[in-house]
Structure formats: structure tokens, C-alpha cells
Amino acid sequence: MANNPEGATKEEPRDLKVERISAGAPGQGPEKPQVIVAPSADVLSGATSTDVPDLGEGTYLAAYWGERPTGGYSLAAESARLEGNRVAVRLTLKKPPRGAILTQALTYPYAVAVVRDLDPRGKRFSFTDQNGTDLGWPVRLVS
């Protein structure tokens, strides 16, 4: 911790540990990309109407890529960094390889993860892709 000129304590930027809980591409889900952030597995379970396993303390998140035209898409929460009250989470979005034989059905890729050592209260969340491009996805904080 460092002191700024006004004497207030300021936390140094730090990388946060992200643990994967689940991921997939089911046949139903939100049509547009979005992220839900919660202070516990129980709260995220209620917000998503699913059973999110409780892996202990941390900030839980569910990221939805939205509707995709075929199978072969995947999404993962890879890393997170805390700078002041801003949390930047990097997602990896993978498209199917060109020429791949794909399921011809609408799919809805998602990823559920827990960010360790982070209390979501008072934080602003942003999400980027693997190239660092801001996704601009809406983020819903639930408590």
C-alpha cells in the first residue's frame, strides 16, 4: 500500500487469480452478450437460475457471449487485474476453425468463474477479449 499526497491509502495494481467453474454452449441462453457479477456462488445461482458450485470466497461471474449461429464457439475467463476500484477481466472467445464440420443449431456460449481475493462491492468491471479489445458488454452486479 502506498500513500498518495492527501494521505489516503491507495492499493497497488495487482493480478487476481481466476478459477474456472464451468463453460459450455447450450441450446438456450441470452441472445446478446452480457456478464453477471455476484459476491457469492449462492447469489449468482439465484441470478442465473442455475446451480453454481460454491468454491469459497471470491467474486463469482457468469459471462454470456450471446447467440451464435452454429456449434464450435467457446468462452473462458482467463485473467483479472485490479487497479484502484476497476477490475479488468480478460475473456478468451474462440470461433470454430474455418472449414470445420459444425452443429447446425443456435448455441449460447458461456463461462462461469470465481475471481479470488476480491470483494465486488464498489468495483467497476470491464471485460476485454484475448487481444485486449474492450468488449463493451453490459455488466449486471447482483447482491
Regions found by a protein language model. Give the residues of each.
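Exposed, flexible binding/inhibitory loops of compact, secreted disulfide-stabilized domains
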Residues: 1-143
